[in-house]
C-alpha cells in the first residue's frame, strides 16, 4: 500500500511544481502590471502638476457694473471664440430687455423730476410703455418688441425724456440705454441679430461664476468672472484657489453716482473699500493685483461737466482737467495699500473698445507672466 502512495506522490510532484510556477509567474505579471500602472499614474499626476503650474488663472473682481463681464466678452472676441446662434438669441433678449426697462426708467424719472413733455401726445406713449410687464422674465419676441418701437422712438425724440436722461446721476439707469435707443431703427427690425458692439453693451447682471479658457502662445489662461453685486460677493471665496492674478475693475466715471443696492453709498467709495479688503488680504501676498480704471470714454465726457470735487472734497487740482482727475483716482486706490514693497500696476480702459482692450491686455499679460510665472518663457 505504501508503495502505491509513493508512486502516486512521484506522479503528482511535477504537476504541483508546474502549478506553483504558474502561480509565481502570474504574481510576477501582476506585480509588473501594478508597477506599470503606478508609473502611468505618476506620469499623469506630473503632467497635471505641470499643467496647473503653467495655467494662468485670472480673477476679475470689482463692484457691480464695473465692466467685468464686458471685459470677459472682449477676451472671447479677441481670442477667436465666436458666439453661437443660441448665445446671439440670448443677447438679443437681453438687449430688448435693456431698452424696455431703461425707457420705463426714463419715463418714470421724467414724471418724478417734474419735467414737462415737449409733445403732450407722448404721454400716451409713456403710459403704453409703463403698462408693459414681464414679471416672469420671459424672452421678448421680436414681433412683440416691434409693437413698442413707435412709442420708444417718439419718447426718445422728446426733449422731456432727453432732459431726464441728462440728470441720470439722480437715479439708476443702465449706461447702454442711449446707445440702444440711438440704434432703435436697426434693432427694431424683425430679422435683427446683435452685432459685436451690441453684445458688448448688452447688460445682464452676473449671477454665479463664469469662466473663459483660452491659450496665448502655448500658455493656457483661465479667466473667472464673479458677480459684483453685494449679494454675489460671498461667492468670490470659491474662486481664490490657485489664482495667478487679480484684475480689479473700477468704473472710473461713477464718482457722482450711488449704488443700486442701497441708493446712498457712493459707487467709487464702494470700489475703494472692496479694493482695500482685497489688496491687503494675506491670501494675495504673492498675487499680482492690477487695477483697471474702466469706462474711460464716459470719464472723458463727465469730467467736462461734473466736478469730482463736489463728491470728493479732498481733490486738489482742476476738476475739469482729465489728467488731474485720473491722477487723483490712482492716488485714492494706491493709498489703500498697506504693503508698499510691490508696485501698483494700473490701466485706464474702455471695455467696450476692442482695440483698447487688445492693447491693454497685451501689456497686462506680460506683467502677469513676469510677476508670477518667471519660469515660463513665451515661445
UniProtKB/Swiss-Prot annotation:
Positions annotated to bind Mg(2+): 69, 206
Post-translational modification, as annotated: Myristoylation of mutated N-terminus in place of original palmitoylation restores the transformation activity.
GO terms (BP aspect): cell differentiation; embryonic digit morphogenesis; G protein-coupled receptor signaling pathway; in utero embryonic development; intracellular signal transduction; negative regulation of vascular associated smooth muscle cell migration; negative regulation of vascular associated smooth muscle cell proliferation; regulation of blood pressure
Region (G5 motif): 349-354
Membrane topology summary: Lipid-anchor
Tagged with keyword Cytoplasm: yes
Residue positions where Phosphothreonine is found in the record: 206
Residue span of region G1 motif: 57-70
Principal location class: membrane
Residue ranges of every copy of the G-alpha domain listed in the record: 54-379
Keyword Cytoplasm: yes
Record's GO cellular component terms: brush border membrane; cytoplasm; heterotrimeric G-protein complex; lateral plasma membrane; neuron projection; neuronal cell body
Location of the region described as G4 motif in the Swiss-Prot/TrEMBL record: 290-297
Keywords of this entry: Cell membrane, Cytoplasm, GTP-binding, Lipoprotein, Magnesium, Membrane, Metal-binding, Nucleotide-binding, Palmitate, Phosphoprotein, Transducer
Domain of life: Eukaryota
Annotated positions binding GTP: 65-70, 200-203, 294-297, 351
Ranges where the record places region G3 motif: 221-230
CDD domains in the cross-refs: G-alpha
Record GO terms (molecular function): D5 dopamine receptor binding; G protein activity; G-protein beta/gamma-subunit complex binding; GTP binding; GTPase activity; metal ion binding; protein phosphatase 2A binding; protein phosphatase activator activity
Subunit structure comment from the entry: G proteins are composed of 3 units; alpha, beta and gamma. The alpha chain contains the guanine nucleotide binding site. Interacts with UBXD5. Interacts (in GTP-bound form) with PPP5C (via TPR repeats); activates PPP5C phosphatase activity and translocates PPP5C to the cell membrane. Interacts with RGS22. Interacts (via N-terminus) with NAPA; the interaction promotes CDH5 localization to plasma membrane. Interacts with CTNND1 (via N-terminus); the interaction regulates CDH1-mediated cell-cell adhesion.
Described function: Guanine nucleotide-binding proteins (G proteins) are involved as modulators or transducers in various transmembrane signaling systems. Activates effector molecule RhoA by binding and activating RhoGEFs (ARHGEF12/LARG). GNA12-dependent Rho signaling subsequently regulates transcription factor AP-1 (activating protein-1). GNA12-dependent Rho signaling also regulates protein phosphatese 2A activation causing dephosphorylation of its target proteins. Promotes tumor cell invasion and metastasis by activating RhoA/ROCK signaling pathway and up-regulating pro-inflammatory cytokine production.
UniProt name for this protein: Guanine nucleotide-binding protein subunit alpha-12
Gene: Gna12
Amino acid at each position: 500500500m505504501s508503495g502505491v502512495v509513493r508512486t502516486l506522490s512521484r506522479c503528482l510532484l511535477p504537476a504541483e511544481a508546474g502549478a506553483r510556477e504558474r502561480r509565481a509567474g502570474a504574481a510576477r505579471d501582476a506585480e509588473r502590471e501594478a508597477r506599470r500602472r503606478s508609473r502611468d499614474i505618476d506620469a499623469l499626476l506630473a503632467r497635471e502638476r505641470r499643467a496647473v503650474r503653467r495655467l494662468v488663472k485670472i480673477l476679475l473682481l470689482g463692484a457691480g457694473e464695473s465692466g467685468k463681464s464686458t471685459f470677459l466678452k472682449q477676451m472671447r472676441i479677441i481670442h477667436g471664440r465666436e458666439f453661437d446662434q443660441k448665445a446671439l438669441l440670448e443677447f438679443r433678449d437681453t438687449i430688448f430687455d435693456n431698452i424696455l426697462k431703461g425707457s420705463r426708467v426714463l419715463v418714470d424719472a421724467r414724471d418724478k423730476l417734474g419735467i414737462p413733455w415737449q409733445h403732450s401726445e407722448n404721454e400716451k406713449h409713456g403710459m403704453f410703455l409703463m403698462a408693459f410687464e414681464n414679471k416672469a422674465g420671459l424672452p421678448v419676441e421680436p414681433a412683440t418688441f416691434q409693437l413698442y418701437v413707435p412709442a420708444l422712438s417718439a419718447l426718445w425724440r422728446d426733449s422731456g425724456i432727453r432732459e431726464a436722461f441728462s440728470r441720470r446721476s439722480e437715479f439708476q439707469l443702465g449706461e447702454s440705454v442711449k446707445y440702444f435707443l440711438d440704434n432703435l431703427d436697426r434693432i427694431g427690425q424683425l430679422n435683427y441679430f446683435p452685432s459685436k458692439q451690441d453684445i458688448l453693451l448688452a447688460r445682464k447682471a452676473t449671477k454665479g461664476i463664469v469662466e473663459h479658457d483660452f491659450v496665448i502662445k502655448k500658455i493656457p489662461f483661465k479667466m473667472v468672472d464673479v458677480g459684483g453685486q453685494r449679494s454675489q460677493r460671498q461667492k468670490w471665496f470659491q474662486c481664490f484657489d490657485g489664482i495667478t492674478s487679480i484684475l480689479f475693475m473700477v468704473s472710473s466715471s461713477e464718482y457722482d453716482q450711488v449704488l443700486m443696492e442701497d441708493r446712498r453709498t457712493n459707487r467709487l467709495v464702494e470700489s475703494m473699500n472692496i479694493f482695500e479688503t482685497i489688496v491687503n488680504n494675506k491670501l494675495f501676498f504673492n498675487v499680482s493685483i492690477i487695477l483697471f480704471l474702466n469706462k474711460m470714454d464716459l470719464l472723458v465726457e463727465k469730467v467736462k461737466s461734473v466736478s469730482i470735487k463736489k463728491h470728493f472734497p479732498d481733490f486738489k487740482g482742476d476738476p475739469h482737467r482729465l489728467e488731474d482727475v485720473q491722477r487723483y483716482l490712482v492716488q485714492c486706490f494706491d493709498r489703500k495699500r498697506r504693503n508698499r514693497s510691490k508696485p501698483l500696476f494700473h490701466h485706464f480702459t474702455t471695455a467696450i473698445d476692442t482695440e483698447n482692450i487688445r492693447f491693454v491686455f497685451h501689456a497686462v499679460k506680460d506683467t502677469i507672466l513676469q510677476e508670477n510665472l518667471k519660469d515660463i518663457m513665451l515661445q
